[in-house]
């Protein structure tokens, strides 16, 4: 424990807080260009074919982002909006692509949680 005199001389250093989405650089979302769109498999107890994309963000940082929802229209050179939020069973995937924004279409025939997937309300 330092003495008061030592604290007067030196002071305390603030704790360094690590962010979960460093590539976003403090922004809620960032725009980027898909460099590769592919599928991958999740870690052990789960089994599926998950759709992911390598995205080069505007700052020049390249990240792996998950494409949520059923079906997508993304390909190389598509311009996408990337938000934070990891996918627990895909190692290294710490970002998600926003559906219904820029070149990404919303999910077709989506009834519930529509705003998350950029789906319009169905006409009766």
UniProtKB/Swiss-Prot annotation:
Pfam families named among the record's database cross-references: Ribosom_S12_S23 (PF00164)
Protein name in UniProt: Small ribosomal subunit protein uS12
GO cellular component: small ribosomal subunit
Cross-referenced Gene3D superfamilies: Nucleic acid-binding proteins
UniProt keyword terms in alphabetical order: Methylation, Ribonucleoprotein, Ribosomal protein, RNA-binding, rRNA-binding, tRNA-binding
Region feature Disordered, mapped onto this chain: 105-124
Xref: InterPro entries: NA-bd_OB-fold, Ribosomal_uS12, Ribosomal_uS12_bac
Family in the record: Belongs to the universal ribosomal protein uS12 family.
GO molecular function: rRNA binding; structural constituent of ribosome; tRNA binding
Gene label: rpsL
Role summary: With S4 and S5 plays an important role in translational accuracy. Interacts with and stabilizes bases of the 16S rRNA that are involved in tRNA selection in the A site and with the mRNA backbone. Located at the interface of the 30S and 50S subunits, it traverses the body of the 30S subunit contacting proteins on the other side and probably holding the rRNA structure together. The combined cluster of proteins S8, S12 and S17 appears to hold together the shoulder and platform of the 30S subunit.
Compositionally biased residues, Basic residues: 111-124
Keyword Cell inner membrane part of the UniProt annotation: no
Domain of life: Bacteria
NCBIfam families for this protein: rpsL_bact
